[in-house]
Amino acid sequence: MLNPGYADEVKEWHKSHPDQEAHFFWDKKTAPPVFRVNDRLTFHRINDVKFLEYMQGCSGYVTTAGFESVCEAMYLGKPVMMIPTHVEQEINAADAVGAGAGIESTTFDVSRLVEYIPSHNADSGVFRAWVQSAEELFIRHLTTLV
């Protein structure tokens, strides 16, 4: 998920890496549903179904470290590069890095993610087990409060 303000940074990175196919989802309301910069760089307006389809097929995921999308990437075993923009995202990124989701960065230098991908441990089994136990954990925590 991309703040439209970062689009120029992504485009600049892509000029140096024109062979790298990249799809970004952004919340730019005035943009068309699909904005193709060239054959290898495309921006998509937010669409939850399309986002998950692309997430499932991607090699890696770049985000500002929003909780939900990082969890979706972890569930699918996708390596993540997180560029947090405020304190909540900084906390999410630190937690996700600690959980093995990927790496943290201060810029949209996607090359860092591309270099990281071969070393990423894509075993999402532990995370999936934790997700599956959520209902039980939630009920247990609620009942201990009563």
Task: Annotate each language-model stretch with its function.
Residues 1-58:
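Donor-nucleotide binding loops and adjacent catalytic segments primarily
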Residues 27-30, 47-49, 85-89, 108-110:
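Short, acidic/turn-prone active-site loops that include or flank metal/cofactor-
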Residues 2, 65, 84, 105, ...:
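Small/polar loops that bind or transfer phosphate-bearing groups
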Residues 91-101:
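Active-site-proximal loop->helix
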Residues 22-24, 79-86, 104-105:
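Short hydrophobic/aromatic-enriched beta-strand-loop microsegments
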Residues 101-146:
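Leloir-type glycosyltransferase catalytic cores
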Residues 15-18, 74, 97:
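Anion (oxyanion) recognition and catalysis
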Residues 50-92:
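A donor-sugar binding/catalytic signature common to diverse glycosyltransferases
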